[in-house]
Regions:
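Class I Rossmann-like S-adenosyl-L-methionine
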Residues: 1-316
Length: 316
């Protein structure tokens, strides 16, 4: 599922695009934002389908060996541990995943040579050799080898990343978040549960998360000039032109959360935007943003403009 932080990042990216368009229709910007979120889930399904594809390739390799004109003893009696891996079998037969793959018409047939190279490299790894030849693996061991395959051979493969980026430029910043979703999916699978378990939903709380995305985008966009003025008033000894555009936008989004999103504590808002700045802005941004937001928050509280609702939120 998409974390609140990733949702904020997606809103930030959508607001940048909206600003670059000269402030086109708000509805168009919001539609593009929702599309970018849907595409994150598409990437999640594509990543899971890759694991299934490697499994299918491994099974086909065994069948090809058996059908050789002069098969070896190894060809006729292959080690089946990997292809019979319980997690892989659960993913392969997962009706929910199969439905998603079919709906998106995902097909890796054009990239079988890349799949072959990836699987060949994986088979040479110390972990794979130990898995195939060591003690009989339990379900935990079976999960662990799939983590190895996914994290070290699929997720970080530059050729695969290029393929994904060609499919959608929107995916460029989503690999880490989606990778975590895939790992959590496998981590939550159970040996004795049909098909392992359910796939991760797109949202933790669909109603609340969609409302956050919608309100944060709309309120930040429509109050852009007001928030700009509020921030400028706090830029003592700072030249406005020296303020990074990312810092300015993150502070506007934080202001929007302070004032308009009643269910999120102000401390959470502060921490989230400071953390986002560490990844998307300058090394000094976290200190700068923290200082400006501290001043703005104190002023807003004094003016009675912070209205937080819910258990443990009043006064935060």
């Amino acid at each position: 599922m998409l974390s609140r932080r990733h949702l904020r990042v997606k809103v930030m990216q959508a607001l940048f695009a909206y600003q670059r368009s000269g402030g086109a229709e708000l509805a168009i910007g919001e539609k593009l934002l929702n599309h970018s979120l849907t595409r994150v889930y598409d990437l999640y399904i594509h990543q899971l389908s890759l694991i299934v594809e490697v499994h299918s390739f491994a099974k086909q390799q065994i069948e090809d060996g058996k059908n050789k004109r002069m098969p070896t003893e190894h060809d006729l009696n292959p080690n089946m541990r990997f292809v019979e891996n319980r997690v892989l079998v659960q993913l392969e037969n997962h009706p929910q995943l199969e439905k998603h793959i079919s709906a998106r018409k995902i097909n890796w047939s054009e990239h079988l040579e890349l799949i072959r190279r990836i699987f060949t490299a994986f088979k040479e790894s110390e972990e794979y050799v130990e898995y195939m030849n060591g003690d009989e693996p339990n379900y935990k061991d079976q999960r662990r080898i799939i983590y190895k395959l996914y994290e070290d051979y699929l997720l970080v493969n530059e050729h695969l990343q290029s393929i994904f980026e060609e499919k959608s430029m929107l995916w460029m910043n989503d690999f880490e978040q989606v990778g975590e979703m895939v790992v959590r999916t496998i981590s939550d699978f159970k040996k004795d549960v049909d098909f392992g378990g359910t796939l991760k939903p797109m949202y933790k709380d669909e109603e609340e998360d969609k409302a956050l995305v919608r309100d944060l985008f709309r309120k930040t966009a429509t109050n852009n000039l007001e928030y700009q003025k509020m921030i400028e008033e706090k830029l003592v000894n700072w030249d406005l032109e020296r303020v990074a555009s990312t810092d300015m936008l993150l502070m506007k989004m934080a202001l929007s959360e302070f004032i308009n999103i009643s269910s999120i504590p102000t401390k959470v808002t502060m921490n989230e935007y400071i953390e986002i700045s560490k990844e998307y802005s300058t090394p000094k941004s976290k200190v700068f943003i923290n200082g400006i937001l501290d001043k703005l928050l104190a002023e807003l509280k004094e003016q009675g403009k912070i209205k937080k609702m819910g258990k443990g939120l009043i006064g935060n």
